[in-house]
Amino acid sequence: MSIGILGKKLGMSQFFDDQGRAIPVTLIEAGPCRITQLKTSEIDGYAAVQIGFGDTREKLINKPSKGHLTKSGEVLLKHLREYRVEGLEGLELGAAITVGSFEAGQKVDVSGDTMGRGFAGYQKRHGFSRGPMSHGSKNHREPGSTGAGTTPGRIYPGKRMAGRYGGKKRTTRGLTILKVDSNRNLLVVKGSVPGKPGALLNIRPAKRVGNKPAQGGK
């Protein structure tokens, strides 16, 4: 069952292995999530599972969403995500999805929004080298040439320039789960994941392990 789970990034810490080596890890509070909808090939054209996560206030949920969530017995859910599956065996509307569906040593893909840094210049956004800082130079943090004059007479699309930095959806693939704490709904994942502490994360079984597709992956 290749269903993922939604969670919240708590921050980073250290995990010590059996040999005493310090490993940087990310702590993720994952679930419990509620199955809010089951889609079938006969009705929807494909099989999928929709889950909900996160508490919210009732006045922030509109009537269509409230009617949709009432079917699963849970109304106050803030985030919804859908996962395509091959079959719906063993899945029930309103059932809980917890970190118990993962295990230590498993590879996962973690998606989230990167930290937004606002409007940033060339050096911070793209890592450009700065100009000479000596007296007489007029190019300290300028980008330099952005293109020729008459030909082509324009700036090519995709030219790296100053602009909004961060706040993009990114996926870190092939991360290893080092520990699963079912009592605290906690996943300890090796390495870093996108987003700042408190950011919403989508954790799902890895599609690829090494250079080969994972079992059940597409």
From Swiss-Prot:
Similarity section: Belongs to the universal ribosomal protein uL3 family.
UniProt keyword Transcription, yes or no: no
Lineage: Bacteria, Bacillati, Cyanobacteriota, Cyanophyceae, Synechococcales
Keywords: Ribonucleoprotein, Ribosomal protein, RNA-binding, rRNA-binding
InterPro entries from the UniProt entry: Ribosomal_uL3 (IPR000597), Ribosomal_uL3_bac/org-type (IPR019927), Ribosomal_uL3_CS (IPR019926), Transl_B-barrel_sf (IPR009000)
Protein name from the UniProt record: Large ribosomal subunit protein uL3
Pfam families: Ribosomal_L3 (PF00297)
Summary of the function given for this chain in its UniProt record: One of the primary rRNA binding proteins, it binds directly near the 3'-end of the 23S rRNA, where it nucleates assembly of the 50S subunit.
PANTHER family (alphabetical): 50S RIBOSOMAL PROTEIN L3, LARGE RIBOSOMAL SUBUNIT PROTEIN UL3C
